[in-house]
Structures are given as structure tokens and as C-alpha cells.
Amino acid sequence: MHADQRKKLTVLMINMFIAVGSFGIIIPILPAYLASIGQGGTAAGLMIAIFAGAQLVMSPIAGKWADQYGRRKMIIYGLIGLTLSMFVFYFSNSVTVLYISRAIGGAGAALLIPAIFAYVADITTMDQRAKGNSYVSAAMSLGIVIGPGIGGFLAEYDLKLPLLVSAIVSGAAVLFSVLLLQESEKHDATAMAPDEGSMLKKLGTSFKKPYFVPLVITLVMSFGLMAYESVLGLFVDDQFGASPKDIAIMVTSTGIISVIAQIFIVDKLSRSLGEGKVLNLFLFIAALGFLLSLLTSSYGGFFAITLVIFLATSILRPVLNTMISKLAGNEQGFAMGMNNAYMSIGNVLGPTLAGVLYDVNILYPFALGLIFLVVTFIGSFIWQKRQARLIAKVEQSS
């Protein structure tokens, strides 16, 4: 990459890091904060579902807007939405208003994330795209690692301080983007997918796209990962008697593994094997991880298996983004919006079903994730066989 590409990519990485990190700051204090206003697990679950639901509803629209009005505007508006969400969260003690803040935050994330990945597609060649997507995904993973750590530290001084700091940091990201982020030169407002009206119609339109199967894989991966994450703490506590410190170490370790994989592994694997083979390989590894999680009898073994699962998903995410981007052609905003929409569907359904199944049997969420991943692996293998010529063409593009 030349200097101008690296500069723009750095700005995008900083934005993604701040956006994800500012949300991650509130994670350690969420249970105690909800308890302080007389709320518990139901409210926590609804906050996740509302955030993901708003993201789902807005994502197709946001993708179209990114194509029509430009990536820069959507990135800035998305950051404004996240900032407003955090300020509403900080100043409110009403659970209803907190739900509203999560809806605003979800809408902001829907504007921000597809626009960032569409921007990456604009400033990179086909050959560079895997590296660009993996760097932005690494910034996301780094935010997930560092945000909660900062939140836990700030909460030692005041329970609501992480909320205020999160809002201020998000606001700084808005100013940062206004001053430093330029519109991507390849953005073409005329190169858009046709306007199909409602979100459901846009989802229907995606069925006909060449990147539909990667979108479905994105949904399944998000479903499995969020289902896994949502019961992870409960499972290691119930099954192995893990302490909060043990759980924190596990979560931090998975984030570190994700960052390392996305910076140092994804691009090399994609170049040597091609996105299609990497996709199948790590779908298989993720499924194997879910299978082993059903069989392990020790905390150490489960810890190691969890690292393997997160390693697989951290590689799958940028690989899928790259494959969708290459297959999308001039519909980058629409494609990334649909990518975010399918991811949001998984983020809503995963924790919801996992929680219900966990109350029946603590192993059922892992069994369900295994079934979904096996079916997806088989589907991906068959799809790639049928579309071998198209996939080979986009993998060889530069």
C-alpha cells in the first residue's frame, strides 16, 4: 500500500477501535449498573437484543446511503449516533430510556460499520482487500480487548464514570473524522443497487446476489459466536466453578488471539490458499471446536477450545468481508449493509436461543451451534464447487 492508502486506513482503524472500545468500556459495569436501578438479567438481554435489532433494521438502509451520499458522511453520522447513545445512557436512570439509548447506538453502528468496510473496498485493490479488512477487523478486536479493561479500571472511582468517558471518547472520534477523514475517491453515487424499498425487500434482493451464501455464513457465524459468548461465563461458572477473574482472563485472551490472527495470519492465508479454501478450513475448525466443547471435562481444556473457536471466527470474519466485497462489484455500500444486517440477525437470534436452551440443558447451546456450523460447512463446500469459476476469478483479481 502507498502512503495515502495507509493514512486513510489508519483513520478508519482508529474510528473502528474507538467505536467498539467506547461500547466495550461499559461492559464490566453493566450488571452492577442495572442492579443499581433495580434491573437484572432480563434488562441486560433486552439491551443486547435492542442494539442488534436496531442495527438489523438500519443496516440495509445505511448501506444504500453509503453508496448514495458517500462513506465519510455515514461514518461521521454513525459516530454521532454512538456518542448520543452514550450520553443518553450516562444521564438516565430509567430502564426505558436506556433501551432507547441502545436503539440509537444500534442505528449508529449500522451507519458506521458498513461505511467503513465499503471505504476499505474503495481505497484498496482486490489484491490488497484481505489485508485492509483484516486490519480494520483487528482494530475492532483490539477495542473489544482494551475497552472492558479501561471500564473496569474507571469503575473503581465511580460506577457511571465509564459511561461519561465512553461518550467523550466517541465525541472525540466525531471531531477526528470531521477534520481528517476525506471522502474515498472511488465512491460513485451512480453505482448503486436498485432501491427495493423496505428492509424485508432488501433482504429478498440479497437472495439473488452472487454473495448471498457468504452472507448466510456471516449470519451463522454471528449466531454461533454470540450464542457461545452469551453463555460462556455462566457455563464455566456452573460447570467448572470459574471465578470472575478466570472469566476476565479468558475473554481478554480471546481478544488478543483475534488481534494477532487478523494482523499477522489472515492476509498470508488468503494469499496462499485463497478465500474459499480458508473459509472452508476454518468453518471446519470452528465446528470441531464446538464439538470438543461438548466433550471436555476440565476448565483448562475448555479454555484452550475457546481460544481455538475465537481464532477460527477471527479469521472467518475478515475473509467473509473480503469475499463479499470482491463479489459485490460496484454495490459496496449495499453489500456491506446487507453483511451488517445478516450479522445482526445472528446477533439477535444467537443469545436469545442460547439463553432459552441453556435453561433446559447447559450443553444445548453448544450442540445447536455445532449443528449450524456443520450444515454451513457442507453448504459452503457445495456452493464453492458450483461457483468454482466465479470464485477463482475474484480470488485472482487485483
What spans do the regions from the language model cover?
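Short amphipathic helix-loop junctions that connect adjacent transmembrane helices
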Residues: 28-41, 231-246
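C-terminal transmembrane helical hairpin of 12-TM major facilitator-type secondary transporters
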Residues: 276-320
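Cytoplasmic helix-loop-helix junction between adjacent transmembrane helices
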Residues: 101-142
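Residue-level signature of mid-helix packing/kink "hotspots" within the transmembrane helices
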Residues: 52-60, 144-145, 255-263, 347-348
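Helix-to-loop junctions at the C-terminal end of transmembrane segments
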Residues: 59-70, 261-274, 358
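Conserved MFS/SLC helix-loop-helix module at the cytosolic interface between two early adjacent transmembrane helices
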Residues: 57-93
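Helix-breaking motifs and short loop linkers at transmembrane-helix boundaries and internal kinks
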Residues: 38, 70, 91-97, 108, ...
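Juxtamembrane intracellular "pre-TM" segments in multi-pass secondary transporters
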Residues: 1-6, 182-215, 398
